[in-house]
A protein has these predicted regions:
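Acidic, proline/glycine-rich low-complexity IDRs
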Residues: 1, 118-161
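Short, extreme N-terminal segment that most often corresponds to the first beta-strand
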Residues: 1-35, 149-161
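Weak global preference for isoleucine
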Residues: 5-8, 13, 39, 48, ...
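Low-complexity, serine/threonine/proline-enriched polar segments
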Residues: 26-127
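Proline-rich intrinsically disordered, low-complexity coils
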Residues: 12-14, 25, 70, 104, ...
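Intrinsically disordered, low-complexity regions enriched in Ser/Pro/Gly/Gln/His and often acidic
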Residues: 20-21, 54, 101, 112, ...
Length: 161
């Protein structure tokens, strides 16, 4: 399976300064990805358009900058929140013996995994912030993005898992 890492900054990123696979932290390859490669300039535009489409009507991409509307969080997380609530409800009914591991339960494991993934998809898209040299799941980045300012997309990196 494949997904994309988007280099996103609140400052323009020059083409010759775009992130490469070498900028990605070791933990990412230890726990998420088994390989990655930079995306060509032609495919980069397609990937940025795919990101804008994924973010929906609460995002605009004008070819230079990405703008997020104040409604981005309300719109983007609607579907995931339904799964989160369903998993939380299932977990709320868990007996202590299952929670402690004394009684194995595949249903419990799946609900716990589903709740975590609905909050932040470990195998989804990522954002690399060159200003702080950190990598975040897209979900985490959206939760903390400042919607009052534009964002610029530098490199795009394909990763597989």
């Amino acid at each position: 399976m494949h997904n994309t890492i988007y280099e996103i900054s609140d400052k323009p990123i020059p083409k010759n300064g775009r992130a490469t696979v070498g900028n990605l932290p070791a933990w990412f390859f230890d726990s998420v990805s088994d390989g990655a490669c930079e995306i060509s300039d032609d495919d980069r535009e397609q990937e940025i358009n795919r990101l804008a489409h994924c973010l929906g009507s609460s995002c605009t991409w004008d070819g230079k900058k990405l703008m997020l509307s104040p409604e981005i969080r309300q719109e983007y997380f609607k579907g995931a929140f339904k799964y989160f609530k369903k998993a939380a409800s299932a977990l709320a009914e868990t007996e202590y013996a299952v929670f402690s591991g004394a009684v194995p339960s595949v249903a419990f494991d799946l609900a716990l995994q589903g709740m975590a993934e609905s909050y932040s998809d470990r195998f989804g898209a990522y954002v690399y912030d060159p200003g702080i040299e950190e990598l975040f799941p897209l979900d985490t980045w959206i939760r903390s993005a400042d919607v009052s300012k534009p964002y610029y997309v530098g490199g795009a990196i394909d990763y597989h898992y």
